Each structure stands twice: as C-alpha cells, then as structure tokens.
Amino acid sequence: MHTDISSFDPALAARLRAAVDSKTKPLGALGRLESLAVQIGLIQDTEAPVLIRPAMVVFAADHGVAQAGVSAYPQAVTAQMVLNFIAGGAAVNVFCRQHGFALEIVNAGVAMPLWSLGVPGLIDAPIGAGTRNFAHEPAMTAAERDRAMALGAQRVAAHAELGSNVIALGEMGIGNTASAACLMARLCDLPLAQCVGRGAGLDDAGLARKCAVLEAALAAHADARAPLDALACFGGFEIAAMAGAMLEAARRRMVILVDGFIASAAALVATRVAPEVQRFCVFAHLSDEHGHRALLAALGAEPLLQLSMRLGEGSGAVLAYPLVVSAVAFLREMATFASAGVSEQAPPALDPAA
C-alpha cells in the first residue's frame, strides 16, 4: 500500500492563519473553528477550501474473540445490523440523510454469508467469515490484513473518483471494542485497565470476563508489537479496512472524519504506519467508551464534540460535519476588517476616575 502522503505548506499555513485573524472578530474569538478552518485549508492546499460530496463508508465484520463472551450481544447482531443499514433504519442512515452524505455499506467479513441473501446495495467483499479468536491465535494472517486494508483503500478511491473530498468511516462488528482495546494497550503501551470498557453494555461480571480474556491474549501475543503485526493479531477486518481507508484518504488529501473509539483505534494504526495521516484527521467526538479519552490523548487529538455517545456506525462523525462546514464557510465568506471598514483597534480603556 502506498504511503506517499504529501506534507503541508508552511507558507500556506501562515496565510491561512492571517486570513482567519483578519476576519471581523477579536483574535481567537471563534475558538476551535479557527484551527479547524486552517486545517481544512491545509488539507486541500488552498486558501479557499470547498467541501464536495461528503461520503460515509461503514465497514462491517465479525470477530472470533466474541466467542469468548466479551460482548453483551450475540454475534448474529452484526449481520442483522447490516440489513438494518441497507434498509435505511439505523442512526447513521438518519444522520447521513439529514446532512447530505453518500452512504455505503461494505461487508468486510461478516460471519453470515450475506451474498446468499442477495442484499441489494451492499458492497459484498468479505475477507473471511469473521476473524479468528485472538484469545487462541492471531485474528488474521498478514495476507488477510493486507487484503482488508486494500479494501478500505479501494472504497475511498471509488468515492474520490466520484468527486468526494470528505470521507467519514464507520463500523459494525460485535466484539470490536475488545479488538480496539487490545490495539490501544499494545500500541500505546498502556495498562489494559485504561483501555477496556463495557462496549455495548456489559455488566460488571461481563466486564471482568472481558478484561481477563484480553489480558491473557495480550500476554500470549507479546511479540506482536509493530503496528501492522498488532493489527493482524488483534484487529478486525473492519478495523483494518478503516486503517487502509485512512491511509488512502490522506494520500488523496481528503478530509477524514474520525468517529469514536473503534475508528480512533484504526487511526492509531494508520498514524503509526504513516504519522502524516494525523494532519488529515478531524476527530469528531469524545465517546463514552472508557478508553477513548486516553486514546485521543495518546493521539494528541482534540475532539469537536462531547455528547456521551457510544454507538459507533460513524454516527458521531456525521454529527460533527456541520462544524466543518461552518469552519469553511466563515473562512470563505466572513468579512475582513478591511473589506467591512471596521477598525481593528480596540477602544481605549475607560478611566474609572473620570
């Protein structure tokens, strides 16, 4: 996979910051929107960025580790949710319709043979019928990992060829918070307790079981430390596809909207493979999943929203998009002090004794 990602232009960065500062407002008054506007301009290599055909790609896959009881839901829910996505009934469907996203659902490795159902509108490209149980063996082979990453890159390329310059990535996969927690623990060198959470709603006993399974798996695969080795050992086909998608999107200078905990774990892998990917990522929100705050801190990422969400699907990425739209709009359309004839000088302070 190509990782020839171009760098940002420091001269353009200076011009963008000057353009932001010239708007009719006190310096820094638009807060996070100001740095976001500069970031989007740098991604697109222009002082006048434009957002075109935002696209959401949801990758679905099953996880062998779900057999170890690390999720509150049965594995069959993955396929059921794929059918719900196709029917238009999930949260991500609603939000994509609301905010004008093209939505694509990709079977990256669901255990149920969805091809046999003849599901219309599904990109059916499974790497396998779910990963292996990494409590006992690596989740996937290096070849399977590479195929999953290539699948993600192919889907991004397809949307780029349709004109999209904004890509959001979502996922569905029972057991994938277990994969994300192990990737985080291994690649960030953090205690598992800081990384693992309740996922889709484990009770205390279920959480204790999940922690025990994952601790044993990390110990059993102590040699899987390089980013791509860890991805093959602990990842899911959908996580690998998202990592590959992010690498391709950065190569194409697209805005990458990163959703919650699972998507951030994919971003962790992608940025460890190619650190330049980070500059193209807009981290949408702070998830309520336990490990997400520490994962964002490890990535040096500042999320746009904090809504106590923990749904996945890419839902938070779509909800954050209007802020990206507003950042671009003020950069392009807001008057400058010069064009509006407004003084840039603050008035003199009043003498309280007068």
Swiss-Prot record:
A Pfam family it matches: DBI_PRT
Keywords: Cobalamin biosynthesis, Glycosyltransferase, Transferase
Keyword Transferase on entry: yes
Reactions performed catalytically: 5,6-dimethylbenzimidazole + nicotinate beta-D-ribonucleotide = alpha-ribazole 5'-phosphate + nicotinate + H(+)
One Gene Ontology MF term: nicotinate-nucleotide-dimethylbenzimidazole phosphoribosyltransferase activity
Catalytic residues in the record: E313
InterPro entries named in the record: Nict_dMeBzImd_PRibTrfase, Nict_dMeBzImd_PRibTrfase_bact, Nict_dMeBzImd_PRibTrfase_N, Nict_dMeBzImd_PRibTrfase_sf
EC number, UniProt record: 2.4.2.21
Pathway annotation from the record: Nucleoside biosynthesis; alpha-ribazole biosynthesis; alpha-ribazole from 5,6-dimethylbenzimidazole: step 1/2
Record SUPFAM superfamilies: Nicotinate mononucleotide:5,6-dimethylbenzimidazole phosphoribosyltransferase (CobT)
Single Gene Ontology BP annotation: cobalamin biosynthetic process
Protein task: Catalyzes the synthesis of alpha-ribazole-5'-phosphate from nicotinate mononucleotide (NAMN) and 5,6-dimethylbenzimidazole (DMB).
Family of the protein in this entry: Belongs to the CobT family.
Protein name as catalogued: Nicotinate-nucleotide--dimethylbenzimidazole phosphoribosyltransferase
Source organism: Ralstonia nicotianae (strain ATCC BAA-1114 / GMI1000)
Organism lineage string: Bacteria, Pseudomonadati, Pseudomonadota, Betaproteobacteria, Burkholderiales
